[in-house]
Amino acid sequence: MEKRKIILDCDPGHDDAIAIMMAAKHPAIDLLGITIVAGNQTLDKTLINGLNVCQKLEINVPVYAGMPQPIMRQQIVADNIHGETGLDGPVFEPLTRQAESTHAVKYIIDTLMASDGDITLVPVGPLSNIAVAMRMQPAILPKIREIVLMGGAYGTGNFTPSAEFNIFADPEAARVVFTSGVPLVMMGLDLTNQTVCTPDVIARMERAGGPAGELFSDIMNFTLKTQFENYGLAGGPVHDATCIGYLINPDGIKTQEMYVEVDVNSGPCYGRTVCDELGVLGKPANTKVGITIDTDWFWGLVEECVRGYIKTH
């Protein structure tokens, strides 16, 4: 089985933690590094959350801090969903893990430039780190095998009626990425909201056990409450983890090729991913957009990753 080399760019975040847990353990993924961006909370908080998850699950992958601010817009955070720390719910031991001294953007550029074009970028937060890397060193563009991202929607947004949070948090960065010419796969809300983590799913992961089962339970029990209060959902979708699922087995997720453009005009559609689902513009598709996911397969995959953390000695 081919191992997909990836850099996971995230803003932990509850669903980000599940994505880290899966990417670090599944044999089909070679997780080279974790880069952190501001998003669900400010950078100082998302960095601590990423380090806490890695320490608890004994994930020995380097962690790099990146962009603390969006490229242009005023910063926003999703404390309504992720709480004051950005990862409210779990209680972690005192943190001893440290981030690398290299800036995430430099790490992304250097790693891609030294590669054979076989590295996939997996940004599951605002696209600030990726866009700055592209602008700073355009020679990385042909080196990127693919970008598999969580963000956007071809239907309704979740932070405004038009826009999904990750794109709305830095629309200008998203515009850079979506016009880059790099092969894109977009897991938007239309797909990710199909992964609502209901109490029975949480109970299943608790039964699977181990440190990852415990962490999954603590994380997703918190989002049960916030997702219901904010969106009336029966649980928290694990938005970001769908990207890892896609990389492990693309057949589990149905996609459609579309031309996607990010609206950067100020107005009610600021930050919208405008997806030409019907092809009315006649422009060539630049993105594979997630449509449906086989949820039975997906939760089986999550459980497989959770079980991977159980110590057998």
Swiss-Prot record:
Q: What is its EC number?
A: 3.2.2.8
Please give the cofactor(s) recorded in the UniProt entry for this protein.
Answer: Ca(2+)
Q: Recorded GO terms, molecular function?
A: calcium ion binding; identical protein binding; purine nucleosidase activity; uridine nucleosidase activity
Cofactor note (record): Binds 1 Ca(2+) ion per monomer.
Q: What is the effect of changing residue 82 to N?
A: Increases KM for uridine 2-fold. Increases kcat 3-fold
* Record: residues binding substrate: 227, 239
Q: Entry's SUPFAM superfamilies?
A: Nucleoside hydrolase (SSF53590)
PROSITE patterns per record: IUNH (PS01247)
Reaction catalysis annotation: a pyrimidine ribonucleoside + H2O = a pyrimidine nucleobase + D-ribose
The biological processes this protein is annotated with in GO are: protein homotetramerization; purine nucleoside catabolic process; pyrimidine nucleobase metabolic process; pyrimidine ribonucleoside catabolic process
Q: Which family does it belong to?
A: Belongs to the IUNH family. RihB subfamily.
Subunit details for this protein? Homotetramer.
Q: Name it.
A: Pyrimidine-specific ribonucleoside hydrolase RihB
Recall the taxonomic lineage recorded for the source organism. Answer: Bacteria, Pseudomonadati, Pseudomonadota, Gammaproteobacteria, Enterobacterales
